[in-house]
Regions:
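Catalytic phosphate/metal-binding cores of nucleic-acid and nucleotide-processing enzymes, i.e., regions
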Residues: 2-129
Length: 130
């Protein structure tokens, strides 16, 4: 008889709007406008993908990058999110996220296989951040 406890690794789950779909138990939505949402956002304008970030406590927005590839735009937004944890106050924010999200599945709208800030949150929450 195996008495070892099976441990499942938390994962990112794509949130759905289909009839009958339910949020899995113990999963946390991490998109905007939650405290875990990525302030870096992407928008397509014609053939160009733009990455923006809102400046806290102002009505200003900065364009971070403009690229022709959606995957690259998403990666730029994820990289910006990751870099936030290297700024003043970033370690405290990472500690808060780790306490709140440890061991939980994370829900976001990003498609599987695409860069997503929830992957950064999973690393932070489960001790895998480099």
């Amino acid at each position: 008889m195996n008495t070892a406890t099976e441990t499942r690794t938390p994962r990112r789950i794509q949130r759905q709007r289909t009839a009958g779909w339910r949020k899995p138990t113990n999963a946390v939505y991490v998109g905007r406008p939650t405290p875990f949402g990525n302030p870096y956002r992407i928008t397509r304008i014609g053939a160009v993908w733009c990455v923006y970030v809102d400046i806290p406590d102002t009505s200003r927005t900065i364009t971070v990058s403009t690229v022709f590839d959606e995957r690259q735009a998403r990666q730029d937004a994820v990289d910006g999110f990751r870099d936030m944890f290297c700024t003043p106050g970033g370690a405290e924010q990472a500690d808060y996220f780790a306490r709140e999200l440890h061991g939980r599945d994370l829900l976001c709208w990003c498609a599987p296989g695409m860069p997503c800030h929830a992957d950064v949150l999973l690393e932070i929450a489960n001790g895998d951040a480099s």
